[in-house]
Swiss-Prot record:
Function according to Swiss-Prot or TrEMBL: Catalyzes the formation of 5-methyl-uridine at position 1939 (m5U1939) in 23S rRNA.
Catalytic reactions on record: uridine(1939) in 23S rRNA + S-adenosyl-L-methionine = 5-methyluridine(1939) in 23S rRNA + S-adenosyl-L-homocysteine + H(+)
Organism the protein comes from: Cupriavidus metallidurans (strain ATCC 43123 / DSM 2839 / NBRC 102507 / CH34) (Ralstonia metallidurans)
Enzyme class: transferase
Phylogenetic lineage: Bacteria, Pseudomonadati, Pseudomonadota, Betaproteobacteria, Burkholderiales
Protein name: 23S rRNA (uracil(1939)-C(5))-methyltransferase RlmD
HAMAP family in alphabetical order: 23SrRNA_methyltr_RlmD
Length: 466
């Protein structure tokens, strides 16, 4: 373990360290949602003073800091020096950590990352909604590195850097990090970052390609090039040669997401697999799919166990996407209805059910679930169990509808809801409605480490109603 912070934890850290003796010191008590260390000063009369948010500091550490933003009740600061290091501090696994904004917690032991994320989840549930789970689930965790199968890479032609940069933004900046590799991307993709820079630099439109979307499937790695001007014949030849050499598939996006099309090789199928269920899921690189394939498989397994559906049950999958949960549920013998707000994803879910021979057990509908009413829910009829997997905005309208139906004495409410969340704040808000107004109890909740080394907190919760 390292007793000093990574010198790249902030661009100013190395130069500032020489003046550390002149900088104020604070004891760090916790981390906030952005993985910043949180400490509190003490006023001269002994009363609690300002809160200090220190980038790169960890709980239990005493650090010297330098403020860059001052407000009456708090300050935001850069880490200058670790005076007393936490036993949780480790050496970051990537040389670009601290400059690149892709990760914020590589300096923290992976087990401690999980513990902190679990605490963030429980704190949100209690402080925002006064809800506690009956049981805290064991965290769902997987590989710490090479897990990111989806990513959006920014492309920027920077004359001062001598050419094109391809990578994530610098931390809290619009600049692109000068990256030669990335430890959270699959190794074969990480190895392509420098060749991609060279490829784009050789194109006639090297300054008219703002981003590259990455989607890795079971056999195919797709790269979607956002092109603001057409490629010429020489450009196309360069792309074909690169695709053959690096075994990738190029897609082009001349305008909005609906204009994406496969360029070369056009005949390859992008798909991910769920081998435990004998399922193959074709998708387009612009479709929403989970970033972390390994965690997704474990998450599906836990969701199915928590639902504990019988073959005679009717199941409802809200925000179903391309059928990530719907189709595995259907393999268990139950009848499943998936509802999704995107027409494109609904169409893909229908096609995937047909592709996997599950059309007879599934049905799909396209509805705006952010504006759903109690009448809309009642019109669906009764489903025994629900799975809800909303985006960061959560499922507020759905939970409000359930609360209204509960208060009206409706019999359409499910006995069990499994809720997969990518925002502890919106999960807490929705849990408050379900528990305090819809008659449910929070039977269990736990974190899902979909994004190791970041402050993103994904989770799974189960609600039960007697």
């Amino acid at each position: 373990m390292s007793s000093q912070p990574n010198p790249t934890s902030h661009p100013e850290a190395a130069s500032a360290a020489s003046a550390a003796s002149n900088d104020p010191v604070v004891k760090i008590d916790s981390l906030d949602m952005e993985a910043r260390g949180v400490g509190r000063l003490e006023n001269e009369d002994g009363t609690p003073g300002k809160v200090i948010f220190v980038e790169g500091a960890l709980p239990g550490e005493t650090v010297a800091y330098r403020s860059y933003r001052r407000k009456p009740s708090y300050e935001q600061a850069h880490l200058v020096e670790v005076k007393q290091a936490s036993v949780m501090r480790v050496k970051p696994g990537c040389q670009h950590f601290g400059v690149c904004g892709g990760c914020s917690m590589q300096h923290l032991d992976s087990r401690a990352q999980l513990a902190i994320k679990q605490r963030v989840l429980e704190d949100n549930l209690w402080h925002l909604s006064k809800v506690k789970p009956d049981v805290v689930f064991r965290p769902i965790a997987g590989p710490d590195w090479g897990y990111r199968y989806r990513a959006r890479l920014t492309v920027r032609h920077v004359v001062k850097k001598g050419g094109v940069l391809v990578g994530f933004h610098e931390r809290k900046s619009s600049y692109v990090a000068d990256m030669t590799h990335c430890e959270i991307l699959p190794p074969h993709v990480s190895a392509m970052l420098v060749p991609l820079r060279e490829l784009v630099g050789g194109l006639s439109i090297h300054d008219r390609m703002p981003q590259i979307e990455l989607a890795v499937g079971a056999e195919v790695t797709a790269l979607v090039l956002r092109v603001l001007e057409p490629l010429n014949d020489a450009d196309k030849d360069l792309l074909r040669a690169f695709a053959d050499q690096h075994q990738v598939q190029f897609w082009l996006q001349p305008k909005g997401p609906d204009t994406v099309y496969p360029f070369y090789p056009a005949e390859q199928e992008l798909a991910y697999t769920l081998p435990e269920f004998g399922i193959r899921m074709p998708f387009k690189p612009t479709d929403f799919t989970q970033v972390n394939h390994q965690i997704n498989r474990v998450l599906i397994g836990r969701a199915l166990r928590l639902l504990d559906a019988k073959p005679t049950d009717r199941l409802l999958d809200l925000f179903c996407g391309i059928g990530n949960f719907t189709l595995p549920l259907a393999t268990q013998g139950a009848s499943v209805m998936g509802i999704e707000g995107s027409e494109v994803l609904t169409t893909r879910a229908l096609a995937n059910a047909e592709y996997n021979g599950l059309a007879a057990k599934t049905s799909f509908a396209c509805r705006n679930l952010f504006e759903v009413t109690a009448e809309d829910i009642a019109a669906l009829g009764r489903f025994d169990r629900w799975l809800v997997d909303p985006p960061r905005e959560g499922a507020l309208a759905v939970c409000k509808a359930l609360a209204e139906l509960s208060q009206a004495g409706s019999d359409v409410l499910p006995k069990r809801i499994v809720y997969v969340s990518c925002s502890p704040a919106t999960l807490a808000r929705d849990a408050g409605l379900l528990v305090h107004e819809a008659g449910y109890r929070l039977a269990g909740a736990g974190v899902v480490n979909m994004f190791p080394h970041t402050s993103h907190v994904e989770s799974i919760a189960v609600f039960e109603r007697d």
